[in-house]
Amino acid sequence: MEEAVRISKILSELGLCSRREADTYIEQGLVTLDGKVVTELGTRAYRSQKVELKKQAAIQQSSKVTVILNKPVGYISHLDDDKAFRPAASLIIQDNFQVSKQHSSRNPRFNTDGLAPAGRLDIDSSGLLVLTQDGRIAKTIIGEQSVIEKEYLVRVE
């Protein structure tokens, strides 16, 4: 017999959003189960049921920012609560922020709040770092089912 699972897990498995984002959408009343709005966190459903995001959730998702950054040595990938180290996200400022041609007509606000690294490079490493507000992108890059290959070049003295 099929087991009921949390709606947030179903939405994540469908690739519509991360579990955390799903919880936010549920709280905002932007998720439907068989056509009825769901607002209670932890609500369970069967995978055979129809779970959907409302259009307002898609609008929220389209405003999320993803940044590709060449992280230099001396910066950390994540935010530092102790303020002892400089986070790579601090390198992203209005003066060096560019919008892709595909999204230039949307006139996005410069907003880097909530950027999270999709992967990590330690303080002594440099290289490509993806910072995103979109859980779908993070899951695609570093999730358990990710097929994206990561390559590291290590130099030893």
Predicted feature locations:
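Basic, flexible Lys/Arg- and Gly-enriched helix-loop patches that mediate nucleic-acid binding at interfaces
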Residues: 2-157
